[in-house]
Amino acid sequence: MPKTMHFLFRFIVFFYLWGLFTAQRQKKEESTEEVKIEVLHRPENCSKTSKKGDLLNAHYDGYLAKDGSKFYCSRTQNEGHPKWFVLGVGQVIKGLDIAMTDMCPGEKRKVVIPPSFAYGKEGYAEGKIPPDATLIFEIELYAVTKGPRSIETFKQIDMDNDRQLSKAEINLYLQREFEKDEKPRDKSYQDAVLEDIFKKNDHDGDGFISPKEYNVYQHDEL
C-alpha cells in the first residue's frame, strides 16, 4: 500500500475510533444523569397518584440552575389558569414527565433536571435557555384525572353510547373539566379548544371522533 494511502487509512480509522469513543462517553455521561426530586409538601391523604397517560392540571416555574434566573412561569399565561397536559407523551420536556410521575393532587415538588432530560446542547427560546443548561422547576399539582385517551374517558364522554364523540359531547366534557379548577374559562376559549381538538383528531372530517381517531396512544382496546 502506498505511503499516502496508508496514512489516509490510518487517519480515517483514528477518527472513526475517536468518534465511537466520544459517543460512548457521552452516552455514559447521560446514563449517569438523573432528575432529582425534592418533595416540598405531600398531602396526608393521597389515594390517587399520577401515571403516564393521566391528564394533569398544574402550575410550575422554571429557573436556570446556573444563576437562579426565572425563564418560565405558567401563571403568566392563559389568564393565570393552571396548565392542562397529558403526562408521559411528550407534551412537556422529558424531565418534567419524569418529575411529575407519582404525584398526588395538592403535592408540591422542587426538581433539578439535567440537560439530557431538558433542551440538551441546542438550548431553547432564542438563548433564554442556553445549551447544556441544568434547569430547576417548582411544581404544584392541582388535579389528576383519567387521560383523555383512556377507555373510561371515551365512555364517559360518549353520552349516547353510539361509539363516536360529537362536538356537543366533547364540549360538555370540556366544560365539566374546566369547572374543576374553579376558574371557568371564557366561552371563546372553550370554543377554540373544541375546534383544535376536531382539527387534530377528526381525520375523515365527518364531524365525529371515532374510537380509532380518539385512541392515538394505540394501547387501549375500545
Curated annotation (Swiss-Prot):
Spell out the reaction equation it catalyses.
[protein]-peptidylproline (omega=180) = [protein]-peptidylproline (omega=0)
Alphabetically ordered keywords of this record: Calcium, Endoplasmic reticulum, Glycoprotein, Isomerase, Metal-binding, Repeat, Rotamase, Signal
- Positions of the EF-hand domain: 145-180, 189-222
Annotated region (Disordered) at 200-222
Which residues does the annotation flag as glycosylated? N45
InterPro entries per UniProt: EF-hand-dom_pair, EF_Hand_1_Ca_BS, EF_hand_dom, PPIase_dom_sf, PPIase_FKBP, PPIase_FKBP_dom
Give GO MF terms, alphabetically.
calcium ion binding; FK506 binding; peptidyl-prolyl cis-trans isomerase activity
Q: What is its EC number?
A: 5.2.1.8
Record note on modification: Glycosylated.
Query: What sort of enzyme, by top EC class, is this?
Result: isomerase
Q: Where is the signal peptide?
A: 1-23
Q: Where is this motif: Retention in the endoplasmic reticulum?
A: 219-222
Q: Which PANTHER family match?
A: PEPTIDYL-PROLYL CIS-TRANS ISOMERASE FKBP7 (PTHR46222:SF2), PEPTIDYL-PROLYL CIS-TRANS ISOMERASE FKBP7/14 (PTHR46222)
- What else is on record for this protein? Binds calcium.
Protein name, per record? Peptidyl-prolyl cis-trans isomerase FKBP7
Specify the species.
Homo sapiens (Human)
